[in-house]
Regions:
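Beta1-alpha1 glycine-rich phosphate/pyrophosphate-binding loop at the start
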Residues: 1-65, 172-173, 237-242
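Rossmann-like dinucleotide-binding core of oxidoreductases
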Residues: 1-7, 104-243
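FAD-binding beta-loop-beta segment adjacent to the flavin cofactor pocket
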Residues: 13-24, 115-122, 137-138, 267-268
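Flavin (FAD/FMN) cofactor-binding and adjacent substrate-gating region
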Residues: 19-32, 225-249, 260-266
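Short glycine/proline-rich turn/loop motifs
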Residues: 30-37, 211-213, 248-252
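Short beta-strand to alpha-helix junction loop
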Residues: 36-54, 66, 148, 218-228, ...
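Feature captures the FAD/FMN-dependent oxidoreductase FAD-binding
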Residues: 40-109, 230, 237
């Protein structure tokens, strides 16, 4: 296994911003063979990183992993019937070959994320921070903060920084669908009182997979009804005098894009 970074964990090791968490339940996001045993199924980043490292150690995978080995190129050699890789380790280039190649590198750059530009960017006197490069030295207590965007990262970040900041505004170009659900699975907590961990995990995993598949089917089959249901839930959260149409009504149908998950209504 070749890992370009100095640590395992990918997103869960890299992202340090306040509130970093999963936006899927860990019974479906987790491995089939390793039960998720924590109470919260919508889990924080450090807990997920611990889970990944436990999995690596329990299966004795660490000895097979090369850290700081970034794949620069991979080409198929038809004559030799194998893959030819050029791998960078520090400043050294290493040639490797393999018969089978699995690419699990994600879809964005860890070192060069998209950084939007805007007018008078250079004249702004405050800090401009990309969440991907958040570190423990950033002090946002009692600060006035604008978060640009309303996707999964913003939905996660805003409730966390609002606890210490003076004032937080989420600035969006267009709304996203936002759905609230409990961070703890009540059925899971109930079944764990009577059933073995592995049995409970299996049942909850399939309960969630089937439920999510069913709701996805309904959203594609009856988009207008599902949209109304989502907006009605938001009205219950924010009050019927809140401008849901302006701030939380996307121009697209439910599940045309991934929905944003809000555990325990923390955004509201």
């Amino acid at each position: 296994l070749l890992e370009g970074r100095e640590n395992l964990g990918g997103t869960w090791d890299l992202f340090k911003y306040p509130g970093v968490r999963s936006d899927s339940d860990m019974h479906t996001l987790g491995y089939r063979f390793k039960p998720w045993i924590h109470d919260k199924s919508i889990a924080d980043g450090p807990s997920i990183l611990d889970y990944l490292n436990e999995t690596v150690d329990e299966n004795k995978l660490r000895e097979h992993i090369l850290l700081n080995h970034k794949v620069n190129s991979a080409n198929w050699n038809s004559e030799q019937s194998h893959w030819e890789l050029v791998v960078k380790n520090d400043e050294q280039l290493i040639n490797m070959t393999c018969n089978f190649l699995f690419l699990c590198g994600g879809y964005f750059s860890y070192s060069k994320p998209h950084m939007p530009s805007f007018k008078n960017y250079e004249n702004f006197k405050g800090q401009i921070i990309h969440p991907q490069f958040w570190n423990d030295q950033i002090d946002y207590e009692n600060k006035k903060i604008i978060v640009i965007g309303s996707g999964a990262t913003a939905i996660t970040l805003v409730p966390a920084i609002a606890k210490k900041a003076n004032h937080v505004v989420m600035l969006q170009r267009s709304p996203s669908y936002v759905i609230s659900r409990p961070s703890e699975d009540a059925v899971n907590k109930f079944l764990r009182k009577f059933l073995p961990v592995k049995v409970t995990y299996f049942l909850i995993r399939w309960k969630n997979i089937l439920w999510q598949s069913y709701t996805f089917f309904l959203a594609r089959r009856f988009p207008d009804k599902i949209k109304k249901s989502i907006l009605d839930l938001l009205k219950d959260e924010l009050g019927h005098d809140y401008d849901i149409e302006k701030h939380f009504t996307p121009s697209y149908k439910p599940w045309d894009q991934r929905m944003c998950l809000v555990p325990d209504s923390d955004l509201f």
